[in-house]
Every structure is written in C-alpha cells, then in structure tokens.
A protein has these predicted regions:
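Glycine-rich nucleotide/cofactor/substrate-binding loop typically near the N-terminus or early
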Residues: 71
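General beta-strand structural signal in soluble alpha/beta enzymes
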Residues: 107-112
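Basic- and aromatic-lined ligand-binding clefts that recognize polyanionic substrates
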Residues: 142
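ATP-binding/phosphotransfer module of carbohydrate and carboxylate kinases, centering on a glycine-rich
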Residues: 1-66, 75-79, 97-105, 119-134, ...
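A charged helix-plus-loop insertion that forms the helical arch/lid used to bind
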Residues: 80-92
C-alpha cells in the first residue's frame, strides 16, 4: 500500500504507548499493534525516545506513511497546555516540535480524546452522520470531543463543566463510580445530570460514549432520559491510534 492510503497512529498514555499502521479507507489496522510501557515519570525526552522506537518499527512497513500522535493534554498550536498522568514538564512545551525533531519527520499532534472522537466520525459510530456529534469517554475522568459535519472542533474539555458545585468528572466519571462503589442506578443519576447539562448547552445530534465501561452500555444507557440519541463507541482500545492516523492524512479536518 502507498502512503496515500495508510498512516501511522501513535497513542500516548500514562501507562503505555501504542501504535499501528492504519488503512485510511477502512479504519483497520494493517500491522500488528505495537505497545511499549510509558517510561517511568513520563518525561518528555523519554517519551519521545519510546515513540521513536515504535514509529521506526511501523515505518519499516511503509516508510512514507504520515504520522499522527495523540497525547493526554490540551493541545494548542502544537503546545501541550496541561499534562494528565505524565510529567508536569510537558506543560507549556512545544511538544509537536519536540516530537518532530526527535522523530526526524513531520507529525500531526492532537489531544487523545479529540483523536478518539475523530476516529468515530471517520470509521465508527458517527460515520456519515451530519450535525454536531459529541463523544465522551468515561474513565479516570471524562474526556470529550466535538465533531461538526466531520470537522474536529478541538479542546472541548467538557469533563470540567461544573455540576452541583463540582467538576463533572469528579462525580460522574467511571472512576467516581468505582471509588464510591456506586450501583449502576446511582451512577446513572449522576450521568443524567451531566448529559442533560451538556445537551442543554449544545443541543447535539448524537452522543457517543467511549471508554472501557462502554462495553457495559446496557447497564446504564437505558436508565438515561435524553432527547439526544446515545450510542456506544465502536472503537475503544484502538480509537486513539485510528484518529491520530486519520488526522495525519493531508487535508484532514
């Protein structure tokens, strides 16, 4: 395959860095998924080196494939404005330039939730859907992505909306359910407050729910009463890889 139909996607997390070569016409991995542990401390130079090793393995299959990298931070013009589960040394860093120097090639650099949302719009639950799509990932926090008519609107940090005097993710994330040992029913009441508020603010056309808990969507989605349709994400473990790769394609949203 040529680089016009493939791209490399890299998903950097607090515990692991994973990547794959993606067929951009189907959204399927056409290589093995390569995963290495995130270096202890999550320092910039160490993460770049680990990423370089993964890209080198994948580029052996298609040396000219463009590269997309998604990262657990607010990303603005290539700078990381926050840092989740990695070193605070990332904050304020021109991370895109750092990766490009370390990898010796141009990349597309994006927030991890934005990459997951874009993956769903291109290859998953929102494929060919018009209007405003909101992806939320329920995990240690609440990640979010906005897609409007297939175009990514970056840095929608909807997990930090204030609900009942607290960050929404401190009360409605899956981590909050586990920490407080909430039943599905009690957790659903918190999700109801959260999604009703988001619905009021944005009037979206579709909610997509991602994160590991989305595989248990039948336990909580039927308990929610919303005007907006809600569906589970199609891509969970590979969403970041697929979205980062798709955004690396020339002319992508």
């Amino acid at each position: 395959m040529t680089s016009q139909t493939t791209a490399i996607g890299i998903d950097i997390g607090g515990t692991g860095i994973k990547g794959g070569l993606v067929d951009l016409s189907s959204g399927e991995l056409i290589s093995e998924r390569v995963k290495l542990p995130t270096p202890a401390g999550g320092k910039p130079a160490d993460i770049v080196e680990t990423t370089k090793a993964i890209v080198a393995r994948l580029a052996a299959e298609d040396p000219t494939a463009p590269v997309g990298v998604c990262f657990p931070a607010i990303v603005k013009h290539g700078f990381t404005m926050s840092a989740a589960n990695v070193s605070k040394k990332w904050i304020g860093l021109n991370a895109e330039e750092l990766f490009e120097t370390g990898l010796g090639r141009s990349i597309h650099f994006v927030n991890d939730a934005d990459a997951a949302g874009y993956a769903e719009s291109q290859f998953g639950a929102a494929k060919d859907k018009a209007g405003l799509i909101i992806l939320t990932t329920l995990g240690t926090g609440i990640g979010s992505a906005l897609i409007y008519n297939g175009v990514l609107i970056p840095n929608a940090e909807l997990g930090h909306l204030e609900i009942d005097g607290a960050d929404a993710e401190s009360r409605a994330s899956y981590a909050a359910k586990e920490r407080e040992e909430l039943t599905w029913e009690r957790w659903a009441k918190r999700l109801q407050r959260y999604y009703s508020h988001v619905e009021f603010l944005f009037t979206p056309d579709l909610f997509i729910v991602g994160g590991g808990v989305s595989k248990n969507y039948q336990e909580f989605m039927p308990l929610l009463d919303l005007k907006t349709p809600m569906v589970p994400a199609v891509h969970r473990n590979n969403a970041g890889i697929l979205g980062a790769a798709a955004l690396a394609r020339p002319g992508a949203a």
